[in-house]
Amino acid sequence: MIDIKLPLTDLHRHLDGNIRPETILDLANQHNIQLPANDLESLLPHVQIIENEPSLVSFLQKLDWGVAVLADLDACRRIAIENVEDAINTGLDYAELRFSPYYMAMNHKLPVEGVVEAIIDGIRSARQNNDIDIRLIGILSRTFGEQACTQELTSLLAHQQHITALDLAGDELGFPGHLFQSHFTKARDAGWHITIHAGEAAGAESIWQAIRELGATRIGHGVKAITDPVLMDYLVENRIGIETCLTSNLQTSTVNSLLDHPLKQFLEKDILASINTDDPAVEGIDIRHEYEIAAPAAGLSIAQIRQAQINGLETAFISDTEKQALRMKAANR
């Protein structure tokens, strides 16, 4: 279902949600960190979704063991490198990897800015001699409150030339977007693009808030947009992209089944919705699964899947010149 003559993108891919289970075991052994299991088979149910979770918050708990083993900055650098390797191995031409430096730092009280530096260095190292375009998106983890987000933002701004965009993720219901308006004003002043997790756990009003108050030009998940026809018209008219994550939305019980997912309706409406992974290691999937299994299960036609692939590049946070270079690369395959 993937058109190899088109660039393959993944715009919504959490670096800290894609820590290999084997790496979790290895780092735990290196740093004498107690895990709930000592072998891969027994560990998997603790770090990967086996059955759909009842909520977003319970889904996010599966990420916690991955960051629990980040005992030093070398570990952070390693997972950045492995994320690029995974992106290459799954056939991506372009990926935007997002990460929350505070979340990655907090278990072992690592310097938050040091985590940012380690991720940047790991990405730079892994990209050498590899034909893949990687951009970084910083995340403010709303779950930890405004003060922690201020610390995250300061650390990200210290390396602003290496960061493409800013995101707000975490407990959407408990920490609504209006709490972080000043953070995103600073991000826009720095020249960053804005993408916001919205309309996943909360309703359409959260998406409106992300656009109007935080300046989002892309929305992560955005499932609840389907409940607001005026919002859907606004998304079309203003070319605001929706970063769809099919399997993730099923596993968080945001939708009851893939056939209930609104992606098909978004595409019929000409909303710039794309197909993305979210947390590949936690979900036990890759981008090919989303295109070849999840998208058809969500009722998408081959033409709609192709359009979603086109939308991925169209809404990527890069210049038109860079997009055209990726198109030429794919066309010549």
Curated annotation (Swiss-Prot):
A biological process term (GO) from this entry: inosine biosynthetic process
Keywords: Hydrolase, Metal-binding, Nucleotide metabolism, Zinc
Protein name, entry field: Adenosine deaminase
Record: residues binding Zn(2+): H12, H14, H197, D278
Record: active site: E200
Function: Catalyzes the hydrolytic deamination of adenosine and 2-deoxyadenosine.
NCBIfam families membership: aden_deam, PRK09358.1-1
UniProt entry tagged with the keyword Acetylation: no
Chloroplast as UniProt keyword: no
UniProt-listed Enzyme Commission number(s): 3.5.4.4
Pfam family, one: A_deaminase
Reaction(s) catalysed (UniProt annotation): adenosine + H2O + H(+) = inosine + NH4(+); 2'-deoxyadenosine + H2O + H(+) = 2'-deoxyinosine + NH4(+)
Cofactor annotation remark: Binds 1 zinc ion per subunit.
Record-listed substrate binding positions: H14, D16, G170, D279
GO cellular component, one term: cytosol
Source organism of this protein record: Photorhabdus laumondii subsp. laumondii (strain DSM 15139 / CIP 105565 / TT01)
One MF term in the entry's GO annotations: adenosine deaminase activity
Site note Important for catalytic activity, residues: H221
Sequence similarity: Belongs to the metallo-dependent hydrolases superfamily. Adenosine and AMP deaminases family. Adenosine deaminase subfamily.
